[in-house]
Amino acid sequence: MCHFTVSVIVPNYNNEKYIRQCLDSILAQTYPVKELVVYDDCSTDGSRTILKEYSEKYSNVKVIWGAKNVGVSVARDTAIRATTSDYVCMLDADDYFYSNTKIEKEMQNAQKIFDQTGKKVVVFSQTIDVDEGGSILTKLKPVDLSGNERFKIVTRRYSNYMPRDYCFPREYYDLCGGYTKNLALYEDWELNLKLLQLTNFVFSGGYGTAYRHKAGGLSSVNYKIQLETKINIIQKFQISSKERICFYAIAYGAFLKNEIKDFISHYV
């Protein structure tokens, strides 16, 4: 039996089109969600009306109304620090939980490991890529990521399986320092690296979040800026020589692959 309590936090900015599906997928979870904390970052669309509706209808839904636009990292950080549960899970307002047993499966793993070792871990599931309308783009077969999670996360070896929207111990967020608030790219990966200093990541074995691909996302950011950001992040952490060599090989390989792809699309 699982004894850990769970909160889910959602940063929102002008997601009127998607916010209902996001909130409904959280409220439909088979595992009880103690708190659903939404940070609204000064939205100017109808999402504020929707959030008021949900906060009035559901006693576990709490909305933090931002006084000024602060960006997603600060929004997440503020929402996380407002939670009081044992574990916290994050979900962006334009995404949704693909499976209504997502949190239950993750917490079963967390409880099992805690009962065996007395240690709290981060538990994640695999994502499914969907387009703006919610149609599935890719539904990759779940892979066994139950081995050396540290190596895979540090080196970004499997970018399609990079842990996101996972359940993590609330106390470890404070201990690791949380989000770096002025980081514009790869802030989630940096948080992964921080949490890795304290505990292990464990794969639940199933699907979790439907990740919505929209114009203006990371894929639209200059590849050189992406590479430089990843290098600046990894240099903050103590990692092994093997991890460092593999990271640079994979990072530069991805950069060159994208540059060649762009060259071919423009000139060939």
Per-region residue spans from a language model:
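A conserved acidic beta->alpha catalytic loop
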Residues: 40-49, 68, 92
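Glycine-rich, basic loop-to-helix element that forms the pyrophosphate-binding segment
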Residues: 66-83
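Conserved donor NDP-sugar-binding/catalytic core segment of glycosyltransferases
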Residues: 101-137
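Conserved nucleotide-sugar donor-binding catalytic segment
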Residues: 125, 139-233
